[in-house]
A protein has these predicted regions:
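Alpha/beta-hydrolase
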Residues: 1-45, 49-55
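Short, histidine-centered active-site or binding-site loop motifs used for metal coordination
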Residues: 16, 56-58, 90-93
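Short strand->helix junction
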Residues: 19, 61-62, 95-96
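Conserved strand-to-helix beginnings and helix N-cap segments that scaffold or border functional pockets
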Residues: 24, 65-69, 98-103
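Alpha-helical elements of Rossmann-like donor-binding domains used by nucleotide-donor carbohydrate transfer enzymes
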Residues: 29-32, 71, 104, 108
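Catalytic active-site module of serine/aspartate enzymes centered on a nucleophile-bearing elbow/loop
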Residues: 37, 79-118
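Conserved loop-alpha-helix segment in the C-terminal half of the alpha/beta-hydrolase fold
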Residues: 51-54, 58-85
Length: 118
């Protein structure tokens, strides 16, 4: 589910910092953060002139295969964010910066950042 790059998956599965059990407090904190960020009043606190670039893998189960990202993108637009962009990378999974097409992702992010520098 992480990436199609089997070298990255093998590295991840063998790394001591990536193969730990999530604690009850970890889950509690995760759900508190998810609850906080999904509240409409918190969307409305985001500065409307803050540019945002949402990128995700279209095959990421964590993002509901792109549907979750589309939903959040629309919520941001509906809250009045003026400059928001979204790109879903077909066939990419959760870690798009570690995918087989990572150079394309890097290039797209660099182009977006360059276009938004003042």
């Amino acid at each position: 589910w992480l990436t199609k790059d089997t070298d990255i998956v093998d590295w991840y599965n063998g790394h001591k910092f990536c193969t730990f059990g999530f604690t009850i407090n970890g889950y509690k904190t995760l759900f508190e953060v998810l609850t906080f960020i999904q509240k409409k009043e918190n969307y409305n606190k985001i500065p409307k002139d803050l540019p945002a670039y949402m990128i995700a893998g279209a095959d990421d189960p964590v993002g509901n295969y792109g549907e979750g990202v589309k939903h959040i993108y629309q919520q941001y637009k509906d809250s009045g964010i003026k400059d928001i962009s979204m790109k879903l990378y077909p066939d990419d999974r959760h870690e798009i910066l570690n995918e087989l097409d990572k150079e394309t992702v890097y290039s797209d992010v660099t182009k977006w950042l360059t276009a938004h520098m003042e």
